[in-house]
Amino acid sequence: MTMGDSDLRKPTNFGTGHLSRRRSWCCSFAVPPASPDTRSISSRNHIPAKSQQQRPKLVPCSPQSSKSALNIVNRIDPRRILSPGRVSPIDSDPTVTTMQETETTQEEEDDAVVVDSTPNLRSESFRAPKIEVTGSGLSEGYDARLSLKGRNGGGVLVLELSLEVLAANSDVFSGLIAEEKKCSSSSSSLGLKNTCRIEVCDVENLGVFRETVELMFEESNVIIKKFMTMGVYRAIDVLEVAAGIKFSRAVLSCLKYLEAVPWTEDEEEKLRRLLGIYSFDDDAVSEILARFNSNETENLQDSLSKKLVWSITSCSDVNPRNELKSLVKGLLCKSSVYEKEQPEINKEDIYRAGKCCVDSLAKLFEEGSSSSSSKKEKPLIESISREVENINWLLEIMIDREIAEEFVEIWGKQRRLVEMHERVSPMVRYEVSRVTGAIFIAMGKRRVQCGGEARAGLVEAWFKPMLVDFGWLQRCKKGLDMREVEEGMGQTLLTLPVKEQYQVFMEWFRWFSKHGTECPNLSKAFQIWWRRSFLRGVESSTCR
């Protein structure tokens, strides 16, 4: 032990241990006390200067540096291993050795960051994508460079490919390669690498074009599996590119896939447009074309519509009848989303079905007026309600097709039905007024333009039954908007000649004064009629 050590071992001469420890750290030439921390320092200090100079700088993360770091960790006093956020009670002031180790560790971390960041920079740099060739017998090098330029500056994509594969799969690329080889003799004489360069401009979708080229390196059975992964919409895009570059294997595989899977309406329209642009082999595309409509189905549409209408009107079950009504109405109406230049529906078939429903309704009313048994009342009501629903359903189709004018005339001539209306029970007869209410609504909204004779016949026949049944209609609306019924009745009455308006409005006034809310409220139309008939008449006579 040296003299410096003996001097440091005399804490009692100074009174406290704190002063002796403070003295040991204040003196830069003093030797610290023996401890696990100072062993490495003493061993370091005894290393010759020559060996220190010849010691090479260790590369971070090398086995040698890891070993030295492990030795340092083993020499650390267990008391110095603290949890994060705690302050050590020992050696609160940093020592020279600690500072050196900290600087060395920081340098190693900086070097590690530099080394680790290098591969990231390389991976982010642009490299032309290559298509791997497996099992084709080709050399590992690529002798063709395909440059794809997107439409309207949509980017550039460069593919390094095999010249033999391109020429074998695409007739278009085969011709371009043949032209390029004619011009390659000059570059070969200059010692340049003989690489065929092909450029395709105005590419709509670079990703689809690349997927199509990648299929050249696959077997035919694998190509179909690729299409199954893509889906129908993407497969149609690939089919368009394959047809453009005359890649027959992909075209045949795609057509085979499309024929075997269902399509959405958007996919069907897209495929229909593509088949109209490119000409495909008849044998390959015949099964797909068979799924589209043909002339035979177009000729059968008229008779099919007739069969559907008659099937619905004769259906006795309520739930399927209502479901089919909604379906067929959506198909036959002009505003239908299914309409694709469909021909006009046969007007006579609709009118024939409507006339048949009206005749059935008249027979049911005759049966109800002559029947005295209460057992038949419930089936009779159900039958009458079904026929009324059929008439209203056909009327909606007629109104949408703008062919309802003649039906209004037919309904206004049902004198026999009007006569039986008075003899039938109110809970049965009000169903008929639902048809009259629907006609009044359509006329009030100007969706049906009838002649004066047809309007007069409708009001003459069905205005009084509407007054009688209005209370029942209010209680059993069945989808009928009573406000619209009142508005439609008032507007229709105002289209009649003034003399006829006088008789109708006076009749309404008497009914409304007796029955009140059980009668339709035509006050607004009555005021208009009053002003037209009297006030404006006085003004016109004064002007004369």
Swiss-Prot record:
Alphabetical UniProt keywords: Ubl conjugation pathway
Keyword Amino-acid biosynthesis: no
Annotated Low complexity bias: 93-103
Matching InterPro entries: BTB/POZ_dom_prot (IPR038920)
Organism the protein comes from: Arabidopsis thaliana
Region annotation Disordered: where it falls in the sequence: 34-66, 82-111
All residue ranges annotated as the BTB domain in the record: 142-225
Role played: May act as a substrate-specific adapter of an E3 ubiquitin-protein ligase complex (CUL3-RBX1-BTB) which mediates the ubiquitination and subsequent proteasomal degradation of target proteins.
Record text about domains: The BTB/POZ domain mediates the interaction with some component of ubiquitin ligase complexes.
Domain of life of the source: Eukaryota
Pathway annotation from the record: Protein modification; protein ubiquitination
Keyword Ion transport: no
Gene that specifies this protein: PRL1-IFG
GO process terms (BP): protein ubiquitination
Biased amino acid composition, Polar residues: 37-55
Protein known as: BTB/POZ domain-containing protein At2g13690
